[in-house]
Structure formats: C-alpha cells, structure tokens
C-alpha cells in the first residue's frame, strides 16, 4: 500500500489499518518510516517493503536485520524498463530550478533499475551487494557538478557515479570517490600512494573522499583494527583497439522463439573494457538467423532497436540474434572504425 497519494482525505495513522487487516502480509510502498510505529499498534502484523528505492536501501535493510516482523523488501526496480521516462534521472540544477518527476524526449526508459536494460549492474547494484553482505567493498567515482550548479537526484534515481577511473579532461581536478563497505574503516590509494583513511558510516556504509584525478590505479581497502582486508580497484584503460563479443549461450534451439544475446565490448590492448568509449559499431550476420534487435543501455539513445549500426554506451552494446528455424549456424560480424573487428558463431540445434 502506498501512502494515500490520490486520496488526501485519508490519513495513514487513522486509515491504514483498515486496509492492512485484509492482508496476511502487509506490503508498504516507500513507507519504511512507519514500520516501527505500526508494530506498536499491531504487534502481530508481518511487514515487507513492497516497493523500495536504491537511495533508501540501507535504511530498509537495516530494519529487516533489526526486526523479525519485517521480512524483506522488493526493489523498484531490479531492471530498467521502457516507460516512466527518466523517473530515475539525475540533473545538475541552478539555484531555483525545479527537478521534474519525469523527463521528456529523448528519454525513453525509466533509468531507475539496479541493472540496465542490457543486463549490466549499475553502481547502485554494487552498493546493494554491500547492504546484502554479498561483497566486502566496492567504490564508484562521482564527477563534481559544474560551477554554480548542484546535483539533484530524483527519488527513484542514483547519484551520477561510475565504476570507472577514466576521466579524460579532469586531470588535476577534484572528483568524489564513494567507497562502500561494512568494514569499520577504509583506506584509499592512488598509484600506490595512501591518500587517507576514513571511518565508514554505519548508517549508509559509505566513506567519501575528494581526490584530484590522475590516471592510473585507484584502490580502496577495507580495514579492521589497522589490518587490511579485501580491496576494490579501478584502473585507467588505454584507447579502444578491438571488439570483443560475448554470447549468453553459444548453442540455442533452431526455433524462432529462441534468442541469443551477444554483448559487444570495446576493449584496449590489455583486454579491458573502455568505459568512456561511445562509438558506432556495424553489425552484419550470415547463416541461419537474423539480427532481431540491437541497442545499448543509454536511457536517451533514440536509435532504433532494429538498427544495424548501434552506438556503444560505456564501452558496450548488444545484438540479439534470432534463428530462422533451421539447424545450422548464425555468425555475427561486428566492426568499428579504427579498430579490429570480431565475429562469433552461434549453433542452432534441433532439440
């Protein structure tokens, strides 16, 4: 149940129980701050967060861990989706500017998911790994807004940060490094030089450093009683020199209802994805299938999903292959100006 957005005459404290009494388990949309209050009134009520947002992941999960009557929460959303355009946007605003709930053209997807529409984890998904104790430490880098502006994150959004240490043009200028961990303290190193150590907030499991950007290696280390534990590393890549193709499956059914999803990556000479490489690639296919779709995760890229020349976003794009119904092979060829192309073959079998 949401707060009564469309029925302002109703009040949560007086009216919510009238609805909750009909439920075996009470779902609260974004209303985590009422969990404990309502438990005092109805100690037998079992509660879960039926919709929660990434910015409130820590407070929601802390309550789950604290109280046995709160059994978990559902994330809005796990995966980006088409529609509710830009509900998860972040803008740089001048004083007095208002941040709209939705965004107009060319925004087309919601951009509020922990995972993008190509299936890649976004920074908030790595942050949630910390909340859920799936990893010990991670970090992301947040460029500062332009002079005279402030970053304004929509309620369903996330700060403008990336798991990248490629910030060409910001050499010598400050960037914000957000380190996420449940360790009591974290240390930050740049090119093997210790920049500092900070306590991690127990409220949101975050420690923030201001760092003057220099290319190289940025390393965050979880520490316990001065003893270093796990680390997270971001490295500056070289320029993109070739394409790498990765298929979710190399063998699929010779059936028009089956699909193969191929990730297109722009990599440097050391095989690392170049996270700031946004450029067009050319797709072609031979054999027993067609290119059913293509695209990237950018929420404002209006290129057709049927395009044979999609653009990469953060160094990646996707091509979707569909069999023609016959047993055989589908070979996808991908090229881009100034770099070595790549091919991948998917077998189609009768099974």
Where are these regions (language model features)?
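Substrate-binding clefts and catalytic carboxylate motifs of secreted carbohydrate-active enzymes
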Residues: 1-257, 269-273
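Extended low-complexity, serine/threonine- and proline-enriched intrinsically disordered segments
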Residues: 185-193, 278-292
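Solvent-exposed serine/threonine-rich low-complexity stretches and specific carbohydrate-binding patches
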Residues: 193-202, 292-309
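Short, hydrophobic beta-strand segments
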Residues: 208-213, 304-325
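Conserved structural position at the C-terminal beta-strand
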Residues: 222, 266, 334-336
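Short beta-strand elements
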Residues: 231-238, 340-351
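Short aromatic-acidic-glycine turn motif
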Residues: 241-245, 283-300
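Short, solvent-exposed loop/turn segments enriched in Ser/Thr/Gly
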Residues: 256-262, 328
């Amino acid at each position: 149940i949401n707060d009564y957005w469309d029925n302002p005459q109703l009040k949560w404290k007086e009216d919510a129980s009238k609805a909750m009494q009909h439920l075996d388990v009470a779902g609260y949309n974004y209303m985590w701050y009422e969990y404990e209050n309502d438990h005092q009134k109805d100690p037998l009520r079992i509660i879960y967060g039926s919709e929660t947002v990434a910015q409130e992941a820590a407070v929601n999960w802390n309550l789950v861990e604290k109280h046995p009557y709160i059994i978990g929460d559902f994330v809005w959303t796990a995966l980006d989706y088409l529609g509710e355009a830009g509900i998860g946007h972040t803008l740089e605003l001048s004083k007095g500017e208002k941040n709209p709930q939705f965004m107009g053209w060319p925004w087309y997807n919601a951009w509020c998911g922990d995972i993008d529409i190509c299936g890649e984890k976004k920074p908030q998904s790595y942050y949630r790994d910390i909340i859920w104790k799936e990893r010990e430490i991670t970090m992301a880098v947040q460029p500062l807004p332009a002079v005279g502006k402030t970053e304004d994150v929509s309620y369903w959004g996330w700060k403008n940060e990336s798991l990248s240490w490629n910030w060409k043009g910001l050499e010598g200028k400050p960037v914000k490094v957000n380190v996420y961990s449940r360790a009591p303290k974290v240390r930050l190193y740049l090119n093997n030089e210790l920049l500092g150590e900070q306590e991690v907030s127990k409220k949101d499991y975050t420690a923030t450093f201001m760092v003057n950007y220099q290319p190289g290696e940025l390393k965050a280390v979880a520490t316990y009683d001065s003893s270093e534990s796990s680390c997270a590393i971001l490295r500056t890549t070289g320029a993109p020199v070739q394409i790498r193709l990765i298929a979710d499956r190399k063998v699929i059914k010779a059936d028009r209802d089956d699909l193969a999803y191929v990730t297109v990556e722009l990599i440097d000479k050391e095989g690392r994805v170049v996270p700031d490489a946004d450029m067009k690639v050319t797709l072609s296919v031979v054999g027993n299938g067609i290119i059913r779709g293509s695209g990237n995760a950018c929420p404002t890229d209006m290129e057709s999903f049927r395009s044979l020349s999609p653009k990469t976003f953060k160094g990646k794009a996707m091509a979707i292959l569909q069999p023609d119904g016959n047993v055989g092979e589908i070979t996808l060829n991908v090229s881009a100006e100034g770099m070595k192309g790549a091919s991948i073959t998917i077998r189609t079998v009768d099974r």
